Amino acid sequence: MKIKPFKGVRPPKEYVEQVQSRPYDVLNSAEVRAEAEGNEKSLYHIIKPEIDFPEGTDEHDPKVYEKAAQNFQMFQDKGWLVQDGKERYYIYAQTMNGKTQYGLVVCAYVDDYMTGKIKKHELTRRDKEEDRMKHVRVNNANIEPVFFAYPDNKDVDAIVAKYTKGTPEYDYTAELDGFRHTFWIIDDDADIQRITELFAAMPAMYIADGHHRSAAAALVGAEKAKQNPNHRGDEEYNFFMAVCFPANQLTIIDYNRVVKDLNGLSDEEFLKKLSDDFIVEKKGAEIFKPSRLHEFSLYLGGNWYSLVAKPGTYNDNDPIGVLDVTISSNLILDKILGIKDLRSDKRIDFVGGIRGLGELKKRVDSGEMKVALALYPVSMKQLIDIADTGNIMPPKTTWFEPKLRSGLVIHKLS
């Protein structure tokens, strides 16, 4: 894998907590307005610039993208973002519930994405790619990083451990979620060279989160190469910013489903149909969480049920067919509830496990939804197997937590 250090554009220590933000795609415009209110230094003015226009302004209006570029320049003019004078790697650690994961902030190579060395597990939507491409073009920068996993490597771990014993550049706990974010600078030339060499020996990296940002960064890089008659291949636009974590440190949490109706069935008829493919056991009113693969938790009519897929209902040798999202999509959502397309069907919604199973109960008890289905989370091993075999995960399969904060460091393309 080809990586390189870069001259990060980042906030001085005293501004980092005001500048940093959550990623662009986890909040809607109204939520961002509320979160950025009264904070002129918030990165949201660059990644969600529609908040600087009257409510109801189309976030895809050309003037909104233009505003992002103006704000990015203004942040630099005012000294809220300052470019490092030297190419460096950085370390970004996140601590959630007492567990810490350590990521290396690097520039990944556009060609590695184009040739499939940077492996995907999700399909991207062209409209979302185009939105991010406009954002990269207008700012001439990767404002937000993507989230990669790499094969565990003790030599990389040792270099990271050496720096994380030292004083961090940033260290704060985010008010909203209580997660701790810590950031160190690697500026020793020998360590920088060693990290580059260690990654060069790796056969692959995996996109954990940020498929649209990765696609956009790579496509803009390829576009700039075409437009440059003197293209050499080592220009800054040939690279895009990623935070790379060892796969063994990452946790995927459950990504659950809620459905509006039972497709014309009564509760009893629905449960009877489920028993064709699942061993169904009523658990009662207390929240029940699945504890292993092929076990599901169902909430219906004030009761929780355990569902265990019967042998023969899935194929252990099929990396996609063996996934619980596939089993539940085929045997429950499609076969019984008539939901064919998870991306477009308005009867279904998805709830990240970070909200807890109480959120599923709440949405059913309120009458908004009729039934909830909780899944056992996908493992990193399953994700890597799927990416390695060139397969694609079904939609809404993986939820990584904690999410990367944006605004700790930015990569300029020239």
For the regions a language model picked out, list residue spans one by one.
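Surface-exposed, charge/polar-rich loops and edge strands
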Residues: 1-414
